């Protein structure tokens, strides 16, 4: 972390999402646009997404080992976030994408993962339809 913060102004992750003022500038999300994910229909869709902003996300440490995999995942949303009770999350725990086991209480979302993430990368994507505006956030973990 020190090397990155001393030598870079920003860094992008390998997770999908929309940048907002609350995101860690060294873990910025992005949607890939390339030969595999570059269809015009998809592009038109993602440029109309909005960030799903949150106060904080745990764990702060995104590097996972045998001791902390699966992680204890918690997100605290801002009080003014509407329709958060309609949130859907998906994760690639166990190396297969599936709907996450979520619990939402008073704007705090927790995910109980069924399996550990497999080496290289674990990801979580959450979205909510906020009165016709699709809001999205993603998180990634580096897995040893």
Which residue ranges define each predicted feature?
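N-terminal start-of-chain detector that recognizes signal peptides
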Residues: 2-3, 46
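Terminal accessory/targeting
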Residues: 17, 21-25, 30-144
């Amino acid at each position: 972390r020190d090397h990155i913060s001393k030598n870079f102004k920003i860094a992008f992750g390998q997770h999908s999402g929309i940048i907002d003022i609350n995101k860690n500038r060294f873990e910025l999300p992005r949607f890939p646009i390339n030969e595999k994910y570059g269809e015009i229909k998809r592009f038109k869709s993602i440029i109309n997404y909005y960030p799903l902003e949150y106060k904080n996300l745990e764990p702060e440490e995104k590097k996972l080992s045998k001791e902390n995999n699966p992680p204890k995942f918690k997100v605290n949303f801002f009080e003014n976030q509407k329709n958060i009770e309609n949130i859907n999350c998906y994760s690639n725990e166990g190396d297969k994408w599936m709907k996450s086991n979520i619990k939402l209480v008073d704007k705090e979302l927790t995910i109980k993962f069924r399996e550990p993430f497999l080496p290289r990368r674990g990801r979580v994507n959450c979205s909510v339809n906020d009165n016709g505006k699709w809001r999205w956030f993603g998180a990634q973990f580096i897995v040893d």
